[in-house]
Swiss-Prot record:
Monomer. Bifunctional enzyme that catalyzes the enolization of 2,3-diketo-5-methylthiopentyl-1-phosphate (DK-MTP-1-P) into the intermediate 2-hydroxy-3-keto-5-methylthiopentenyl-1-phosphate (HK-MTPenyl-1-P), which is then dephosphorylated to form the acireductone 1,2-dihydroxy-3-keto-5-methylthiopentene (DHK-MTPene). Pathway: Amino-acid biosynthesis; L-methionine biosynthesis via salvage pathway; L-methionine from S-methyl-5-thio-alpha-D-ribose 1-phosphate: step 3/6; Amino-acid biosynthesis; L-methionine biosynthesis via salvage pathway; L-methionine from S-methyl-5-thio-alpha-D-ribose 1-phosphate: step 4/6. GO terms for biological process: L-methionine salvage from methylthioadenosine. PANTHER family: ENOLASE-PHOSPHATASE E1. Belongs to the HAD-like hydrolase superfamily. MasA/MtnC family. The keyword Zinc-finger does not apply. It holds the Pfam family Hydrolase. InterPro entries: Enolase-ppase_E1, HAD-like_sf, HAD-SF_hydro_IA, HAD_sf. It is an enzyme of class 3 (hydrolase). The gene is mtnC. GO terms for molecular function: 2,3-diketo-5-methylthiopentyl-1-phosphate enolase activity; 2-hydroxy-3-keto-5-methylthiopentenyl-1-phosphate phosphatase activity; acireductone synthase activity; magnesium ion binding. This is Enolase-phosphatase E1. Keywords: Amino-acid biosynthesis, Hydrolase, Magnesium, Metal-binding, Methionine biosynthesis. It comes from Shewanella halifaxensis (strain HAW-EB4).
């Protein structure tokens, strides 16, 4: 029973972590106050504001307080769904205005075509929202890559460090765990995926990166399936 699908992490695996931490996160933090002020009555944004109030256990939090909470979550790199949804909406404006392009490692761009030729399905799994993932891959230096993916998963699928998230992916794409390969740079994610029965490979793009007992690669060019 061979590999039929690849699930890739984004930050640190397909995308330079510096792009996320030094461009996307600061951009969302800077734009957040004005974005919330202007869009607070948009249904999706309004729902996110309510979710923030619920998670923070502050049901009566003002818009200013919600903004303060979200800015703190950005600093902490919290994987909270309402934050990720709002960040995705803010980044959509940034991409549309041409303020940045989505960084994708060239070795992954090249590998995508090979996976399609092999008949493999390709999915991404990120703590960033599905919308943010689609924006990242559609605004890459190599153009729109979204048609090379079969789907995307985010925090609504589960916490990437918990086994259940990968069980949910298995159920969604209707393959057996051993037919799926998960590639990530984060050991805790690989451990959770392995516990769910998936094949795993660690992407090590930085020599200072923490490694464990999993097979490692430094480029998708090294990945043989």
């Amino acid at each position: 029973m061979g590999i039929r699908a690849i699930v890739v992490d984004t930050a640190g695996t397909t995308t330079d972590l510096n792009f996320i931490e030094e461009i996307l996160f600061p951009y969302s933090a800077k734009a957040l106050p004005a974005f919330l002020e202007e869009n607070q009555h948009n249904v999706l944004v309004e729902n996110c504001i309510c979710d923030v109030q619920d998670i923070a256990l502050e049901p009566d939090a003002s818009l200013a307080r919600v903004t303060e909470i979200l800015l703190q979550w950005i600093k902490e790199d919290r994987k909270a769904t309402p934050l990720k949804t709002i960040q995705g909406l803010i980044w959509k404006q940034g991409y549309a205005n041409g303020e940045f392009k989505g960084h994708i490692f060239p070795d992954f761009i090249e590998a995508l075509d090979g996976y399609k030729q092999q008949g493999l399905r390709v999915y991404s799994f990120s703590s960033g929202s599905v919308e943010a993932q689609k924006l990242l891959f559609s605004h890459s230096d190599a153009g729109d890559l979204n048609d090379k993916f079969n789907g995307h998963f985010d925090t609504r699928t589960g916490n990437k460090r918990f086994k259940q998230a990968y069980c949910n992916i298995v159920n969604t794409i209707s393959l057996s765990p051993k037919q799926i390969l998960f590639v990530s740079d984060v050991l805790e994610e690989l451990k959770a995926a392995s516990e769910a029965g998936l094949n795993v490979v660690q992407m090590v793009r930085d020599d200072s990166q923490r490694t464990g007992d999993f097979k490692t690669i430094s480029s998708f060019a090294e990945l043989s399936i």
